[in-house]
């Protein structure tokens, strides 16, 4: 009789009749593995960086990485094209090793391993950039500078005008006047943070005159326009693609990120 009672107890326990037992985790509830780190994804510097999925509005999951430590942080907004976060990776590595700057890099919707629902590209880029700044602040950043190249420069200007609390500075490397309904001149007129603009005279996408117009439109006193040598565009102006021979502009941008606005 005792054996029968014990057997019945085991059966009832296995049934979970009180509804308190939890089903095994399904594949959908198991966290996805982190995206490849920049050293693997991009090549170039082999510095270890933390890769992660950056959540953005609408259910977007963006391939992202952070390198370096400390409260002084740069959030990089890449150019259009397939390179995504890789375009700024060598520079971010240099900042971490030589300037004590932490960098947040991410690939926008439609680039790299980032996964996004269908939607307006402009809205997605702006929302993703805002999410990256928020992530940086949530993870210890006390001083945040947005740095954008080409289209990323346009996006960086726009986000710098709208995000609250404000970022501590913004850098526009060859960002054109307009992109898919976003007007850089209108954004420049609303800026209330230190702003650095850079352009090369041989740039076929944006002229020195256009960049000077954006610079002059910024109402704050703390601003600077750098006309670099040659014909580079966007992150090309920084030089040092192989991790060396960084341009004078690269040093200027690093100082801007560190809060030395001159």
Put a short name on every predicted segment:
Residues 70-71, 78-83:
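Active-site glycine-rich loops that stabilize anionic/oxyanionic intermediates
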Residues 184, 206-216:
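Short alpha-helix in the alpha/beta-hydrolase fold that links the catalytic acid
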Residues 148-156:
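Gly/Ala-rich beta-loop-alpha elbow adjacent to hydrolase catalytic centers
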Residues 191, 197-199:
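Short beta-strand/loop motif that positions the catalytic acidic residue
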Residues 81-93, 108:
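The serine-hydrolase catalytic nucleophile loop
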Residues 30-67:
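N-terminal cap/lid segment of alpha/beta-hydrolase-fold proteins
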Residues 119-139:
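Alpha/beta-hydrolase active-site loop
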Residues 96-115:
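Conserved alpha/beta-hydrolase
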